[in-house]
Design a protein with these regions (language model features):
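Short, polar/acidic, helix-capping and beta-turn segments at strand->helix junctions
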Residues: 1-99
């Protein structure tokens, strides 16, 4: 299952959530988890994530959010600094999951 990049958007309104970079990364992970649950998958099934970060090269906040949410062993992770993300989001996370 390929989950396309999830921005830190409220699933009800589509508006970006406010907060720290870690809080925004957590919302991205909430959105990834919601997509996975539609196919009866969980974050435990994720084998690879790609983190897109715009406007900063401080990946530590995103790493902290991922460490809190993913079980061990953590999935493989690529971190990519980009010029921009849709709606001006500072972070987006995509995932690959399988059973």
């Amino acid at each position: 299952m390929f989950v396309s990049a999830q921005r830190p958007a409220d699933p009800k309104t589509g508006a970006l959530v406010k907060g720290s970079l870690k809080e925004m990364a957590t919302q991205c992970l909430d959105n990834v988890e919601a997509v996975l649950s539609e196919l009866d998958l969980t974050l435990s099934d994720v084998t690879k994530v790609t983190v897109l970060l715009a406007g900063t090269d401080d990946f530590s906040a995103v790493d902290a959010a991922c460490e809190e949410r993913f079980p061990r062993p953590m999935p493989a992770c690529s971190r990519v600094q980009v010029v921009s993300i849709a709606q001006g989001a500072p972070v987006a996370i995509e995932a690959i999951a399988c059973r």
